[in-house]
């Protein structure tokens, strides 16, 4: 199973936050993908 992305912290740069958001979206997509 994919690992949950680590939150970069409250003083993360916007780039880090964007990266985290993208990884989180991909992670959630993997979790919710139906398994046929």
Curated annotation (Swiss-Prot):
Superkingdom assignment: Eukaryota
GO terms assigned for molecular function: neuropeptide hormone activity; neuropeptide Y receptor binding
Keyword Secreted applies: yes
Keywords: Amidation, Hormone, Secreted
Subcellular location per the Swiss-Prot or TrEMBL entry: Secreted
Keyword set includes Secreted: yes
A GO-annotated cellular component: extracellular space
GO biological process, one term: feeding behavior
Tyrosine amide, modified sites: 36
Protein family (similarity comment): Belongs to the NPY family.
PANTHER family membership: NEUROPEPTIDE Y/PANCREATIC HORMONE/PEPTIDE YY, PANCREATIC POLYPEPTIDE PROHORMONE
Function according to Swiss-Prot or TrEMBL: Hormone secreted by pancreatic cells that acts as a regulator of pancreatic and gastrointestinal functions probably by signaling through the G protein-coupled receptor NPY4R2.
The protein, known as: Pancreatic polypeptide
Species of the source: Chinchilla chinchilla (Short-tailed chinchilla)
Upper classification of the organism: Eukaryota, Metazoa, Chordata, Craniata, Vertebrata
């Amino acid at each position: 199973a994919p690992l949950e992305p680590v939150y970069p912290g409250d003083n993360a740069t916007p780039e880090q936050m964007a990266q985290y958001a993208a990884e989180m979206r991909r992670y959630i997509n993997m979790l919710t993908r139906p398994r046929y």
